[in-house]
């Protein structure tokens, strides 16, 4: 059995295509969510896998067993706190403060309860039992810190049983400056990756960075992006739930989606606000904004900006809907370019450099005045962009296909994992 361990929206986005491909190739696959706070039953990608007959469950539900009254009590507290947390996320803004505060405190208490269970019950013996009961041949994670959830115990148990571990991409690295994120240090990267047997990265840019950080080059293989492979994009289009009504497609208006990056990536928050106000005032345009899915506690930065919040709309649907996409450092530019739509890179909103910028595969915008001029120009002619198709082709080759000439990305993932799996 090939075990895939997931935790959040983004890693599920990148691991689902691989699990799907392996299942189609006849490999036994199971997907387990390590995060009790994530509602995996409402995730359309995991629902899709489950309908194919793939086992999808919470890890602690699948492999837990009764260990006494204290364990049962703590487990119940975790379950109830997760329910309260999900409820608080859907509360209206006019809900009394005390109710929001109560849900928040229950959620925090649930986290504490989970940590107590993890410390007292989810130990190395439990990890061994998971591998034995599942008949694991390989364990696959995203690029996760081993100290999170029960990852380190699973890695140790797998090593003791000679079962290989794989660290798979949960995104696409596109920053060409190493200081793109303050806490991303060489020491942190080395400690994060060196505990895994095999590390798969989407592009050479990411491999070179990890090697410079002290990660063994022998462990790293470049296989491209499963999430943006043509095979998965076509499949995802068939299964994704759509939220944008047909009436939101007036042909006379320019449809624009703005997808900023996480604020932690040296974002200029003042100019971000100015840009939102500029977009809100543009005539004959429909503009939606979708904050990054990992924005987390900084979501308040995007409130009251006079733009419709598209957080509940999938990125893939927004790329379909929009005539033009505005991006900063997000890999979503890849899907935009593969759909042959204009991609405007708002360089002035952060202090980083990017691969698509250096390859000339986008329209680089240096200030608010240039942005307004570019949008006015595209209103007249949506195809009038200052970058050529050859630049886009080279970008897609490096980012999606890992620099390879052949394009069977998912097949390469399946072949590599099965070739290095245990017996």
Put a short name on every predicted segment.
Residues 3-232, 333:
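Active-site and donor-binding regions of nucleotide-sugar-utilizing enzymes
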Residues 136-137, 317-328:
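Acidic donor-binding loop of glycosyltransferase active sites
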Residues 141, 201, 326-327, 365:
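Short beta-strand scaffold positions
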Residues 159, 319, 337:
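Short alpha-helix at the nucleotide-sugar/activated-sugar donor binding site of glycosyltransferases
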Residues 162, 323, 340-342:
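A short alpha->beta transition loop at the rim of the catalytic pocket in nucleotide-sugar-dependent
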Residues 214-217, 222, 293, 301-306, ...:
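Catalytic binding pocket for nucleotide-activated donors in carbohydrate/polymer assembly enzymes
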Residues 227-301:
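Conserved catalytic-core segment of nucleotide-activated headgroup transferases in glycan assembly
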Residues 399-423:
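C-terminal alpha-helical cap of glycosyltransferases
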């Amino acid at each position: 059995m090939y075990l895939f361990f997931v935790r959040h929206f983004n890693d599920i986005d990148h691991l689902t295509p691989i699990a799907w491909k392996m299942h189609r190739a006849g490999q036994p696959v199971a997907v387990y969510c390590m995060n009790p706070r994530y509602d995996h039953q409402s995730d359309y990608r995991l629902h899709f896998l489950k309908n194919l007959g793939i086992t999808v469950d919470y890890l602690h539900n699948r492999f837990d067993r009764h260990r006494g009254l204290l364990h049962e009590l703590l487990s119940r507290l975790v379950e109830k706190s997760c329910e309260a947390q999900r409820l608080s996320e859907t509360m209206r803004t006019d809900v009394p403060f005390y109710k929001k505060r109560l849900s928040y405190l229950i959620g925090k208490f649930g986290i504490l309860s989970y940590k107590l269970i993890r410390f007292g019950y989810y130990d190395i013996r439990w990890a061994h039992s998971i591998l034995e009961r599942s008949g694991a041949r390989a364990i696959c994670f995203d690029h996760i810190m081993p100290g999170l959830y029960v990852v380190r115990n699973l890695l140790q148990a797998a090593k003791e049983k000679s079962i290989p571990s794989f660290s798979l991409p949960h995104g696409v690295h596109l920053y060409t400056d190493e200081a793109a994120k303050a806490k991303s240090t060489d020491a942190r990267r080395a400690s994060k990756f060196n505990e895994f047997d095999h590390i798969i990265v989407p592009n050479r840019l990411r491999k070179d960075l990890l090697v410079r950080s002290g990660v063994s080059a022998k462990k790293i293989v470049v296989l491209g992006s499963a999430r943006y492979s043509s095979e998965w994009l076509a499949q995802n289009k068939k299964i994704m739930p759509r939220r944008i009504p047909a009436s939101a497609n007036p042909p006379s208006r320019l449809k624009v989606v703005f997808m900023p990056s996480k604020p932690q990536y040296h974002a200029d928050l003042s100019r971000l606000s100015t840009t939102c106000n500029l977009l809100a005032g543009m005539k004959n345009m429909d503009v939606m904004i979708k904050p990054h899915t990992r924005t987390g506690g900084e979501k308040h930065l995007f409130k009251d900006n006079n733009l419709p919040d598209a957080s509940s709309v999938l990125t893939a649907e927004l790329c379909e809907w929009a005539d033009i996409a505005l991006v900063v450092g997000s890999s979503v530019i890849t899907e935009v370019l593969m759909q042959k739509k204009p991609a405007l890179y708002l360089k002035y909103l952060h202090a980083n450099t990017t691969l698509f910028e250096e390859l000339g595969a986008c329209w680089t915008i240096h200030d608010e005045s240039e942005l307004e001029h570019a949008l006015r120009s595209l209103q007249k002619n949506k195809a009038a962009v200052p970058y050529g198709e050859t630049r886009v082709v080279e970008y897609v080759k490096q980012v999606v296909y890992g620099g390879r000439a052949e394009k069977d990305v998912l097949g390469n993932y399946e072949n590599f994992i099965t070739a290095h799996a245990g017996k």
